[in-house]
Design a protein with these regions (language model features):
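Acidic, proline/glycine-enriched N-terminal capping motif
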Residues: 1-100, 105-107, 249
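Internal amphipathic helical hairpin motif
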Residues: 72-106, 139, 167-203
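Conserved small/polar residues in nucleotide/adenosyl-binding loops
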Residues: 254-261
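Well-ordered mid-protein domain cores that form the structural environment of catalytic cofactors
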Residues: 88-118, 122-138
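The conserved catalytic core of RNA pseudouridine synthases
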Residues: 189-225
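Residues forming anionic-ligand binding surfaces in small-molecule and nucleic-acid pockets
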Residues: 50-62, 108-118, 152-153, 203-216
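Internal alpha/beta scaffold segment
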Residues: 126-153, 217-218, 222-250
Length: 263
């Protein structure tokens, strides 16, 4: 037998309590689907996808790789490693990017958020977080040694959840009322930072309007220590809107139905 570590999101036990069937994604355990009664996997993921399309759904995205890219030359660095340009990305905006290996094959894809002039928040796919970090460190240490850029793996520091569906904005307007959720104020690929108030606790969060399924959707990240609390808080709102939690099978299904790129 070969020993291998297992990584779990901050909301792992809540997924089990909700009846999730878990699956492996890289080193992580992620919810595969949430069956009701005697549902098969096909029954469950089709229901989850349909509910998300009709009302609202929430999925755990904590396992995505997360890398802080900081420094005076961070923009130049990102503009070199992605095949699409990042030089004109303004503060408060996110952009989807594709990264290639030295042989021209795709290494990874994901979104990068510009939080400040010299501060970016990069997300990677779950399985490629390590290889992407290694690739970028190699570039800085052996090829572009003149660039003033600092990389930090912050995957374990942030709990992430995506809220998708036609009622996603309505839900978040109630859950995080400090923000203006209108299309004018919160356009596609916009990035905001706010505070979630749960009882006497104030929790800082970063939110981007990003869709992986073709529906209106938002990604929300909070400190990992508050992940379980925020997940339960938002799950209660999901239930009020007749929505559901959904797993990776529904993610893949809705992603393909939306004709989105899959790496």
């Amino acid at each position: 037998a070969h020993w291998a570590p297992t990584r779990r999101s901050p909301m792992h036990h809540q997924h089990l309590a909700a009846g999730a069937v878990m699956t492996d994604a890289g080193l992580w355990k992620r919810p595969w689907y949430y069956p009701h009664a005697a549902e098969t996997i096909d029954d469950a993921y089709i229901r989850e996808a349909a509910t998300t399309r009709q009302t609202v759904g929430m999925v755990d995205v904590s396992t995505l790789g997360k890398i802080a890219v900081q420094g005076p030359d961070a923009t130049t660095f990102l503009n070199r490693i992605y095949i699409n340009g990042f030089a004109k990305l303004t503060v408060g905006r996110a952009r989807y990017g594709v990264m290639l290996r030295d042989d021209g094959m795709v290494l990874d894809d994901g979104t990068t958020w510009r939080l400040e002039d010299d501060d970016y928040f990069m997300t990677t796919t779950t399985a490629q977080a390590g290889p992407v970090m290694q690739f970028m460190e190699e570039l800085l240490q052996t090829r572009w040694t003149d660039l003033r850029v600092h990389l930090s793996s912050v995957t374990d520091l942030w709990a992430g959840m995506a809220i998708a569906g036609p009622l996603a904005r309505n839900l978040l307007a109630q859950a995080v009322p400090d923000l203006d959720w209108s299309d004018e104020a919160f356009s596609f690929m916009a990035v905001k930072q706010s505070t979630i108030h749960i009882a006497d606790t104030e929790i800082e969060c970063r939110i981007a309007r990003i869709s992986f399924s073709g529906e209106r959707a938002f990604e929300l990240y909070v400190n990992a220590d508050h992940g379980a609390m925020v997940w339960q808080y938002l799950a209660d709102f999901v239930a009020r809107f007749d929505g559901c939690l959904y797993g990776m099978e529904a993610v893949s299904y809705t992603h393909l139905r939306a004709h989105e790129t899959t790496v």
